[in-house]
UniProtKB/Swiss-Prot annotation:
The modification N-acetylserine is found at S2. This is Cytoplasmic dynein 1 intermediate chain 2. The modification Phosphothreonine is found at T89. WD repeats lie at residues 251-300, 304-344, 353-394, 403-443, 448-493, 496-536, 542-581. It comes from Mus musculus. The gene is Dync1i2.
Length: 612
C-alpha cells in the first residue's frame, strides 16, 4: 500500500511540475509577443515622425521660394573622429581643403554676406458680413421666386422612369399570366376548414352590424324641431314600433312558440319556432337569437334540431347556453361558442325523462345552486343539471287527488321562489304545486276558465308591497283572469277580447301593469290603477296575424310579440305607462281592495238570487 501511495504522490508531483513548465513557457511566449508588438508600434511612430518632418521641411522651402528667397544646400562636413582633428598637419589640412573645394565645386560656390532682414506680416483677409431686413412687394421679382422654387424643388431621379417601366412591365406580365386556379377539392377543403368557418362566421356578423347601422346625421341638438315632434311625443306615451325580426328561410311559414330575453345580455332575444310544412327537408325545430343592439336584419345565431321546439329559454347564469323543449319530449342544449348549429347536449328519449311535448322550461335557483325545470303535457316534472342531461336529478308526476295526470301547458314561479309554482292545464284548471317537502306535487286547484290555459305568469314587480301571491292567466275562452293563491276563485276577469287570448305577462317594473295578446293580432296593456274595464293602450300588428307570445324586456320599456307567421315585433312602451310612480304600489293595494269588495258583493248577490 505504501508503494502505491508513494507512486501516486510521485505522479502528482510530476503533473504539478509539468503544469509549472507549461505556464512558464506560456508566460514567456506572451512576453515575446508583447515585445514584438511594442517594437512594431515604435517603428510605425518613428516613420510617422520622419514623414511629418519631411513634410514640414518641404512646406518651409515652398514658402521661402514664394517670397523670392533661394535656399542653398547646407554643407555637411564629413564626419571626423576626434583623433583625426587633434593630429591633423598643415599638409593634411591643405589636402583636406582641396578635397573640400572639390566637393564645394560640385555643390556650388558658397557666398557669404550680410543682409537686412525685412519682416513682412500678411494679415488675414477680412470678411465683413451683415444682415438687412426690409419689407418690399414681392411682385417685382416673380422670375427670381420661380427660379428659387425651381431650385428648391428636388428633381426626380433619372432612375424613376426605368422603375416605372419595370413596374408597368411587371403589371402587364401579372395581368397576362392567369392566376393559380384552385381545384374543387382544394376549394372544398378551405371552405370546410375549422379556421375558415370560424373566421367567416365572426367576420360576417361584424360586417352585417356595420352595414345595418343607421345614424341620423341631421339630428338637431338645439331643440328647434321639438314643436314638429310634439305629436310624436304624445304618441310615444302609448306604444310605438321599434323593430321587426323575420328571416326568409328560418322564419317563414313557422309559428313563434316561445320568446325569452337574456338576463346577461339584455339586447339578445331567443325565439323558438314550430316546423315548416312548406319545407319538409328543413329541420323541424328552429331557435333564432336576435340582437336589438344593432340594426341588422339577420339573426345573431341560428340553432335547429330534429323536432319542433315548443319552448326555449336562455340558461340563467350561463350566458352562452340556450335550452329548448321539443315536441318529441327531448330537452336540447345549444352553445353559441360551438360552430355547430345542432345541440351540444340532449336528454334521452326514455321513460326516465319526458315522452310528451315539453311546453315549459325554466332555470331557477342561484349562481351556485340552480336547476333546469321542465314539464311535459303528461304531467311529468323533471329537474336537471345543465352539466349532465343524460338523466334527471329528480322527477315527479303532477296528479290531483289520485285522478289522471295534469296536462300542463304553462308554468310560472313566483319571484325569489324555487319550490312553489303554478301551472295551467289543457282542462282549463289552474294548479299550485311544490317541488319538495311533505306535500310535494299538486296543492290546490283553481277553477274559473272555460277553455285550455294558454299562458300564466306570477307578479314580477318588486316594491314596497309584496304582491307575489298574484298571478294572471289567459285562455281560449277569450278572457284574462286575475288570481291570488289565497283564494281558489278569480279576483277579476278581463273580457275585452273577441278571440283566443294566447299569452299574458306582468310588467317586471310596474306593479299594476300587464300585457296580453290575442288571435286578432292585438296587443293590450292593462294598467289596473287606471282602469279595469278597458286596456290602457292597444295596438294591432299589420295584417292581423294571431299573436302567440308576449315578453317584456327586463327594463320594462320594450315589449316583444311573436305571431303565427314567424314574425317578431318589438314595441317601445311610453314612459308614462312603463315607468311607475312612487305611489303605484299603494294605489295598486287600494285597487285590489276595491276588486275584493266588488267580488264579495257580487257573491252575496248571487247567493241571494239562488234561493229566490
Amino acid at each position: 500500500m505504501s508503494d502505491k501511495s508513494d507512486l501516486k504522490a510521485e505522479l502528482e508531483r510530476k503533473k504539478q511540475r509539468l503544469a509549472q513548465i507549461r505556464e512558464e513557457k506560456k508566460r514567456k511566449e506572451e512576453e515575446r509577443k508583447k515585445k514584438e508588438t511594442d517594437q512594431k508600434k515604435e517603428a510605425a511612430v518613428s516613420v510617422q515622425e520622419e514623414s511629418d518632418l519631411e513634410k514640414k521641411r518641404r512646406e518651409a522651402e515652398a514658402l521661402l521660394q514664394s517670397m523670392g528667397l533661394t535656399t542653398d544646400s547646407p554643407i555637411v562636413p564629413p564626419p571626423m573622429s576626434p583623433s583625426s582633428k587633434s593630429v591633423s598637419t598643415p599638409s593634411e589640412a591643405g589636402s583636406q581643403d582641396s578635397g573640400d573645394g572639390a566637393v564645394g565645386s560640385r555643390r556650388g560656390p558658397i557666398k557669404l554676406g550680410m543682409a537686412k532682414i525685412t519682416q513682412v506680416d500678411f494679415p488675414p483677409r477680412e470678411i465683413v458680413t451683415y444682415t438687412k431686413e426690409t419689407q418690399t412687394p414681392v411682385t417685382a421679382q416673380p422670375k427670381e421666386d420661380e427660379e428659387e422654387e425651381d431650385d428648391v424643388a428636388t428633381p426626380k431621379p433619372p432612375v424613376e422612369p426605368e422603375e416605372e417601366k419595370t413596374l408597368k412591365k411587371d403589371e402587364e406580365n401579372d395581368s397576362k399570366a392567369p392566376p393559380h386556379e384552385l381545384t374543387e377539392e382544394e376549394k372544398q377543403q378551405i371552405l370546410h376548414s375549422e379556421e375558415f368557418l370560424s373566421f367567416f362566421d365572426h367576420s360576417t356578423r361584424i360586417v352585417e352590424r356595420a352595414l345595418s347601422e343607421q345614424i341620423n346625421i341631421f339630428f338637431d341638438y338645439s331643440g328647434r324641431d321639438l314643436e314638429d315632434k310634439e305629436g310624436e311625443i304624445q304618441a310615444g306615451a302609448k306604444l310605438s314600433l321599434n323593430r321587426q325580426f323575420f328571416d326568409e328561410r328560418w322564419s317563414k311559414h313557422r309559428v313563434v312558440s316561445c320568446l325569452d330575453w337574456s338576463s346577461q345580455y339584455p339586447e339578445l332575444l331567443v325565439a323558438s319556432y314550430n316546423n315548416n310544412e312548406e319545407a319538409p327537408h328543413e329541420p323541424d325545430g328552429v331557435a333564432l337569437v336576435w340582437n336589438m343592439k344593432y340594426k341588422k336584419t339577420t339573426p345573431e345565431y341560428v340553432f335547429h334540431c330534429q323536432s319542433a321546439v315548443m319552448s326555449a329559454t336562455f340558461a340563467k347564469f350561463h350566458p352562452n347556453l340556450v335550452v329548448g323543449g321539443t315536441y318529441s319530449g327531448q330537452i336540447v342544449l345549444w352553445d353559441n361558442r360551438s360552430n355547430k348549429r345542432t345541440p351540444v347536449q340532449r336528454t334521452p328519449l326514455s321513460a326516465a325523462a319526458h315522452t310528451h311535448p315539453v311546453y315549459c322550461v325554466n332555470v331557477v335557483g342561484t349562481q351556485n345552486a340552480h336547476n333546469l325545470i321542465s314539464i311535459s303535457t303528461d304531467g311529468k316534472i323533471c329537474s336537471w343539471s345543465l352539466d349532465m342531461l343524460s338523466h334527471p336529478q329528480d322527477s315527479m308526476e303532477l296528479v290531483h287527488k289520485q285522478s289522471k295526470a295534469v296536462a300542463v301547458t304553462s308554468m310560472s314561479f313566483p319571484v325569489g321562489d324555487v319550490n312553489n309554482f303554478v301551472v295551467g292545464s289543457e282542462e282549463g284548471s289552474v294548479y299550485t304545486a311544490c317541488r319538495h317537502g311533505s306535500k310535494a306535487g299538486i296543492s290546490e286547484m283553481f277553477e274559473g276558465h272555460q277553455g285550455p290555459i294558454t299562458g300564466i305568469h306570477c307578479h314580477a314587480a318588486v316594491g314596497a308591497v309584496d304582491f307575489s301571491h298574484l298571478f294572471v292567466t289567459s285562455s281560449f275562452d277569450w278572457t284574462v283572469k286575475l288570481w291570488t293563491t289565497k283564494n281558489n276563485k278569480p279576483l277579476y276577469s278581463f273580457e275585452d277580447n273577441s278571440d283566443y287570448v294566447y299569452d299574458v305577462m306582468w310588467s317586471p317594473t310596474h306593479p299594476a301593469l300587464f300585457a296580453c295578446v290575442d288571435g286578432m293580432g292585438r296587443l293590450d296593456l292593462w294598467n289596473l290603477n287606471n282602469d279595469t274595464e278597458v286596456p290602457t293602450a292597444s295596438i294591432s300588428v299589420e295584417g292581423n296575424p294571431a299573436l302567440n307570445r308576449v315578453r317584456w324586456t327586463h327594463s320594462g320599456r320594450e315589449i316583444a310579440v311573436g305571431d303565427s307567421e314567424g314574425q317578431i315585433v318589438i314595441y317601445d312602451v311610453g314612459e308614462q305607462i312603463a315607468v311607475p310612480r312612487n305611489d303605484e304600489w299603494a294605489r295598486f293595494g287600494r285597487t285590489l281592495a276595491e276588486i275584493n269588495a266588488n267580488r264579495a258583493d257580487a257573491e252575496e248577490e248571487a247567493a241571494t238570487r239562488i234561493p229566490a
